[in-house]
Amino acid sequence: MSANYMRLLCLMACCLSICLAYGPVRPIVNRYGRGRVIDVVKPVDTAEAQAAALTNAAGAAAASAKLDGANWYALNRYGWEQGRPLLSKPYGPLDKLYAAALPPRSFVAEIDPVFKKSNYGGLYGDKTITLNTGAKLAVSVA
């Protein structure tokens, strides 16, 4: 998610809360004098829902930013070495798919520095991986 998308989302939430807070809500009266019952939603009732929506959007943005810095090939290789494949595919960033699957109010913890992308270049699916461990370590995949 980009910064412009987050700004638009916050602006939309603010406009919605203003409209709900100050919008005129009157019972509809027909020509016979009987009014229908209208369910009035007050701003106090929607504050929690608005806070949850903004928190979910912030969680998705944080998760996307952290996942962009991950080396998916190294994560997948590590999973196979541990005997538990992580099923991460080297298709590229999966941040939109991951953000859509986030449970409410969840945040991704900091990704281990070992699995971040190399500063020396390298794309998804390269044969040589340089891990950011502070030491000069390269793993060659045959």
Curated annotation (Swiss-Prot):
Localization: Secreted
Pfam families: Chorion_S16
InterPro entries: Chorion_S16
One GO term describing the cellular component: egg chorion
Alphabetically ordered keywords of this record: Secreted, Signal
GO biological process, one term: chorion-containing eggshell formation
Source taxon at top rank: Eukaryota
Keyword Phosphoprotein in annotation: no
Signal peptide positions (record): 1-21
Chief site of localization: secreted
Chain's role: Chorion membrane (egg shell) protein; plays a role in protecting the egg from the environment.
Family, similarity comment: Belongs to the chorion protein S16 family.
Protein name as it appears in the record: Chorion protein S16
Organism: Drosophila grimshawi (Hawaiian fruit fly)
